[in-house]
Amino acid sequence: KPDRRQRQMCIRDRHSGEWLTTPEILEQHIRAYWHAGYQIHVHVTGDLGLQLTLDILQKMQDEKPRFNHGFTLEHFGFSTPEQIRQIKALGAQVSANVYYLHELSDSYSQSGIGYERASQMARLGSCFNAGINTTVHSDFTMAPAEPLNSMWVAVNRVNHAGDVMGATECLTPHQALQAITINAAHVIGMADITGSIRSGKRADFTVLDQDPLTCDPMSLRDIG
């Protein structure tokens, strides 16, 4: 069961979520795959679920230390600065669905968790600043499978109402380009063959009609 600290995270603002996988079952599954040497990806959205996952990862490192384990936090909706420090210390990676910030933060701020927390969804800037390998994904069909659209959200953090949400978490265009290319390749264990243009790697590239590093950031999703 969640400990006292975890329960406080859940009730401090009178909001709570639901476990799609119970803490006991999650730990059981993670332990089995960790000890078998697998790379583990955990889908986690809330900060309570994130804390549980990080606590389990710490247990696994205590039981059987592993380096370059590639443990990845998928979706990464809500987090705290302390949790980001833990992610870095534990050597985990982040694969965030940044599109949810664009699509859901306005409704969340009005009728769900409040503006402050809604604006801090997908803290990509903090992850980059902490030196965490961070990428973004679409979660298709839940969001468009369009990397440049994800890049646009990561750089501008504009929701569908036109509001900038959590401007301090914006990525630079270069960081966002890394997030949809080489960082993504690291997350799936393919950085040695794809994700960047280098001698010996696959000739895996796209020709665009604008330079995403120099164009107007608001036009990123319109690049053809």
Indicate residue ranges for each PLM-predicted region.
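Short, acidic/polar
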Residues: 24-29
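His/Asp/Glu-enriched, well-ordered alpha-helical/loop segment
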Residues: 31-41, 48-71, 75, 85, ...
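Active-site mouth loops of central-metabolism enzymes
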Residues: 12-22
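Short amphipathic alpha-helices and their capping/turn segments at secondary-structure boundaries
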Residues: 79-93
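Short, solvent-exposed beta-strand-terminating loops
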Residues: 5, 93-95
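Single conserved hydrophobic/aromatic residue that forms the stacking wall/gate
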Residues: 1-11
